[in-house]
Design a protein with these regions (language model features):
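Phosphate-binding/catalytic loops
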Residues: 2-9, 13-15, 120-220
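Conserved active-site segments centered on acidic
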Residues: 1-105, 113-128, 210-219
Length: 220
């Protein structure tokens, strides 16, 4: 088990998609109306707060669902959670996860281990770039940020190095329990549960966005 920050390793695989200057993050849940919309929009919000001057084409953040409610709006409680964080919920429509989404993605972050398994089962060499959100957070925390390329080299270059380093840590840095890698589904739950899930997602995203950008986030 890793005992401290590790360098960003090479040779652990890389994204299958995108040009050298573009990095795509795909968030996956079941219906694409609760967890993955919250995660997508909180990721965008956090990136914009830290990298306001980075072209939008450098980091593209999307989401889809394994049983996606194609064309549906996000749940009202999900939109309310985003409003709590000051994040934009407008213009969202649900999508069903397709092969093309996985092919294009440089990093796939799922709500649960079952979602991760479903993405990997689609093929497209997705295994080395697909993690649950909380799994990726745990691995990222063990990576020495000083070993990642500086932001001056481009945010996409830094992001790809981060994914390679995280993939190299698999099997060495295990979850304390299977449930530790899960974000539970709030579908149909009251707003209080949605808010607890929103906080959980935000806390998991913070070290990921910090590692991607090299910028610590402002306090909420």
């Amino acid at each position: 088990m890793a005992s401290g920050p590790l360098p960003a390793g090479a040779g652990a695989g890389g994204g299958a998609a995108g040009g050298d200057d573009t990095f795509r993050i795909l968030h996956v849940s079941t219906g694409n109306v609760c967890r993955s919309p919250i995660t997508e929009r909180l990721t965008r919000h956090a990136l914009a707060r830290r990298l306001g001057d980075i072209p939008a084409s450098s980091l593209i953040v999307e989401s889809a669902g394994t049983w996606g409610h194609e064309g549906a709006p996000m749940e009202a409680n999900a939109a309310a959670v985003l409003a709590d964080f000051g994040a934009d919920a407008s213009g969202f429509t649900g999508r069903e996860l397709l092969d093309e989404h996985v092919i294009r993605a440089d990093l796939v972050l799922t709500a649960t281990r079952d979602h991760r398994a479903q993405v990997i089962s689609m093929g497209h060499s997705a295994g080395l770039r697909t993690f649950t959100l909380k799994e990726f957070t745990r691995l990222v925390r063990a990576i020495d940020p000083a070993t990642l390329p500086p932001l001056d080299d481009g945010v996409a270059e830094r992001a790809r190095a981060l994914v390679r380093a995280a993939a190299a840590l698999r099997g060495w840095l295990l979850a304390p329990s299977p449930d530790a890698d899960e974000v539970h589904d709030p579908y149909g739950a009251p707003i209080t549960f949605f808010r607890s899930i929103g906080d959980e997602i935000s806390q998991a995203l913070d070290p990921v966005v910090t590692a991607l950008t090299g910028c610590a986030g402002p306090s909420r």
